[in-house]
Swiss-Prot record:
Belongs to the universal ribosomal protein uS8 family. Keywords: Ribonucleoprotein, Ribosomal protein, RNA-binding, rRNA-binding. GO terms for biological process: translation. The keyword Ribosomal protein applies. This is Small ribosomal subunit protein uS8. One of the primary rRNA binding proteins, it binds directly to 16S rRNA central domain where it helps coordinate assembly of the platform of the 30S subunit.
Length: 132
């Protein structure tokens, strides 16, 4: 089966695993998925990320994070730019998610960045997803 939007699939797998409070999630690897997972780790939305090389595509193992009482750290993830409708943001118009409580993941010429990093580096790009 051909997957038309692997990023949306990755975000959906995280969302679904988060809803049923799984500790670990495994997805097929790609560079953009690794980048998104690293941003989520750096911003404190997930515990850890491991990349397992299996000689083929590889696997990304994502360790989800929950609060002390079991509450979810990730409230929601939303895919913004899709294969059928790309959404770009100029450097002046980089979006804020929930007035800074969430993050926007943006693919720029500098690589994958959060909205805050994109504003600091004064770059725009394709808005991949919102996480809050």
């Amino acid at each position: 089966m051909v997957m038309t939007d692997p990023i949306a699939d990755f975000l959906t797998r995280i969302r679904n695993a988060n809803q049923v409070k799984h500790e670990v999630l495994e997805v097929p690897a790609s560079n953009i998925k690794k980048g998104i997972a690293e941003i989520l780790k750096r911003e404190g939305f997930i515990k850890n990320v491991e990349v397992i090389e299996d000689g083929k595509q590889g696997i990304i193992r994502v360790f989800l994070k929950y609060g002390q009482n079991g509450e979810r750290v990730i409230t929601n993830l939303k895919r913004v730019s899709k294969p059928g409708l790309r959404i770009y943001s100029k450097r002046e118009d980089v979006p804020k998610v929930l007035n800074g409580l969430g993050i926007a993941i943006i693919s720029t010429s500098e690589g994958l960045l959060t909205d805050k990093e994109a504003r600091q580096k004064n770059v725009g790009g394709e808005v991949i997803a919102y996480v809050w």
